[in-house]
From Swiss-Prot:
Protein source organism: Mycoplasmoides gallisepticum (strain R(low / passage 15 / clone 2))
Gene: potA
Recorded family membership: Belongs to the ABC transporter superfamily. Spermidine/putrescine importer (TC 3.A.1.11.1) family.
Nucleotide-binding as UniProt keyword: yes
Descriptive protein name: Spermidine/putrescine import ATP-binding protein PotA
Coiled coil (UniProt feature): none
Amino acid sequence: MEDKVFIQLRNVNKTFDDGFVAVRNLNLDINKSEFVTLLGPSGCGKTTTLKLLAGFEQPTYGQIKINGIDIKDMPVHKRPFATVFQDYALFPNMTVYNNVCYGLKIMRVPKENTDPKLAVEAENIKKEAEKKAAAKIKDLSRKKNDLSNKLDKIRKEYEKNDWMLENDEMRFAQYQEELIKLEAQLSEAYEQSEINKLNQEIVELKTNYQKKIPIDNRYDKVLKELENADGWTSYWETYPIMKKEHFENKVLTRRLTKKEIEERANNMIKLVGLTGKEDKYPSELSGGMQQRVALARALVIEPETLLLDEPLSALDAKVRKQLQNELKRIHKELNITFILVTHDQEEALSLSDKIVVMSQGDIEQVGKPNAIYDSPINEWTAKFIGAANIFDGKYLGDYKIELNSGDIIDTDEEYEFKKGDNVRVLIRPEDFDVVEKDQGFFNVEVIKTSYKGVLWEVECLMSDKTKIKVDNIDEVKVGAIVGLKFDEMDVHMMRKEEEDV
C-alpha cells in the first residue's frame, strides 16, 4: 500500500441553517489505496462527512483537498469519486448489465495517435490558467485575512459575557428549543423555589439572547463573506485543471466503443460475482445481489476513490458477512481508496486499514483497528468499539495500578501518566482467564452466566461491588468464588475525564 496522503480534510465544518453543527473543525488525512472507515453512532457526522467529500453537501468552511488541491467547489461529476448508497439507487427499468454500463456510456478515454502538439497546447492552457488563478488567489487571501481579523474582533465581544461565550453557537432555533424546554419545566414545577429559579433562568435567557442577536448578525454576515471568499479560492485552485480537462475532452479524448463497454462491463460483473445475472432486473434480485450491482456500477468507471454509505446495513447477517469478504477482496484487487461509513464496530474492525471514530460531529480517535480496540483514547471510545470493563484506579508508577477495590495490578504501558494520577483502566472481557480461587490476581463472585454459542458470558462481582464481564469457554457456576488472571499487555490506562476527577 502506498503511504502517500491523497485526501486531506482541514478544519472542515458543516453547520446547517437551523444552527445544528453536524461536523465540527474536522481534520483527517487519507492515504492512497487505504481502506478507511468512518465509524460512529447515528448523528455523529459520519454520513455528512461522506456527503461533503462527494459534493452532495457543501462545507460551511474548511478545505477538502485531493492531491493538495481544494475541491470543495468542484462539481460532483468532476470529483474522482464514485458512491455506493445504502438503498442501492439502481435504475429499476434497466437490467443488471445496463445498470453497470450506464456510467461507461459517458466515460471518456485518451485518443490514440494524437498530434503531440495538442498535448503541449493542453499544458500551455494549464500554465496560463495557473497564472490567472494565482493572482486571483492572492487577492482572495488578503480578503480572507481581513475578514478573519474582523471575526476575531467580534469574538472578543462574546468573551465579555460568560453566557454569550458559553452559548456562542446558539441561534434562533436553539434559543427557541431552550426556551420551550424551560417553559415546560416551569409548567410542571410545584415548589416555589424551583418556580422562582426557572423564572429567573427564562428571564436571563431572553435578556442575554436579545443582547446577543446584533453580535450574531454581524458575526454571521462576516462569516458568510469569509465562506464565499473561501469558495472562490477553491474555484480558482481547480480552475487550471478544469481548463485543461475541457480542452482535452474536445481534442484528446473519446467515448468508449461498444466493444470496450462490453468488455469492461463483463469484467466488472465477473469481479463482483454477478455472472449469469446480466439480464435480470433489480426487482428480481435479492438485497445482496442488488448491492453487488450498485458496487459494479460504481467501480466500472474506475474512480480513484469509492465512497460507501452504509451499503450493507440493510442486509441480513449472513449476506452481510459474505459481502464484507467481497469488499475486502475487491479492495485488494483494485488497489484504490475505499471510504466506508458504518455504525457496525465488527465491520469496521474487520475491513479497515484505518478507523475514524466519530461522536457528535467530532473525531474521537484515528488509528489502525487493533490500536483503536486495544488502546482507546477515552472511555467513550472504549465502550463504543466493543465490550469493555472500566475500573477506577490510581497509577502508582513502575507500571503498577491500584484499583479502587484495593487490588494492585500490572500494565506494560505508561505513556504520559505520572505517579499518583487518577486513571480509568480498561480490560476487555475476552482478556480474562478464569482460574481457581486465590490463583489469580484477585477473586470475584460469579453472579450471572449466559451462553452465547461459543463462549459463556460470566458476570462477576469484585470486592468493592464493581461488576465485570468475563468471556469463558467453560461454564462457571453462579455463586462460585473464582480467581481472574490477565496479561499485562491487556491492561490499558485512560485519563480520567475532568468531570470525573
